[in-house]
């Protein structure tokens, strides 16, 4: 008699974690839409604010020159007024120069006052606009932070669920190692963890690992006379698992890329897609993926029970 383990509880734990991940994902999508609402306001008002800011800054540029010119002509006037003329002609020239300087100083002061008035007028418009802009950005940052908090919790929950699923697969593989001599040439239990967590490798290997466990279990049940080939063939397991894997890849990689491009970039996805529809599609794909995975786990748990109930035949 070979030693077999009951792994159905690990499968059920995976299902519970799936429900938690799905709930967190839906909440994160709602938070993403709230962020999108404030973010679209910020983006729509950015051009107007930047124009107002540029006008306000440009209006301030002449003030430094005005101050320098007023100071220069004031100093020149003070110097001329302290100067004494040695002759009548020099006195006349000095007097004319003083009058010219006074007039120039008055013109510069008037110009300075005009520029100050323009800045003051622009400040009346820019001040509230700046406060509104700061408030919009503050609200937007707060909404983004709330989303990322939920998003990271969802990611951690998904990684935990993935680990439990990988452990479930490893335990099922170990059962096969114990009852099927030919499995010594197949994948080892530890490869379940490698398949799920090694980048690039995890794009296809989890599917092939799961298929091998499922198919070899079917063969073991047939070989022991517990089920017939016809009974195993009706479930179309290979096609079913391929569809599950396609939805999983789409949910984890494709939709996350689309969501990131839609909500955190300002390119084609942001402009041309309906943001609410993208969220709905992401949720629907996730729900389908979870449903397929649920059916698959429950299906294999049934096979696990069949192995245990007929352990003496191996």
Q: What annotation goes with each model-predicted range?
A:
Residues 238, 244-314:
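Juxtamembrane transition segments at transmembrane-helix termini in multipass membrane proteins
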Residues 21-40, 254-256:
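Alpha-helical transmembrane segments of multi-pass membrane proteins
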Residues 189-211:
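Hydrophobic, aromatic-rich membrane-embedded alpha-helical segments
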Residues 168-177, 207-219, 291-314:
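Cytosolic juxtamembrane helix at the C-terminal end of the final transmembrane segment
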Residues 206-243:
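Membrane-interface alpha-helices
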Residues 146-169:
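Selective detector of the "anchor" transmembrane alpha-helix that sits immediately C-terminal
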Residues 33-148:
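Low-complexity, proline/glycine-enriched hydrophobic segments characteristic of transmembrane helices
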Residues 3-25, 185-197, 232-252:
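Alpha-helical membrane-anchoring segments
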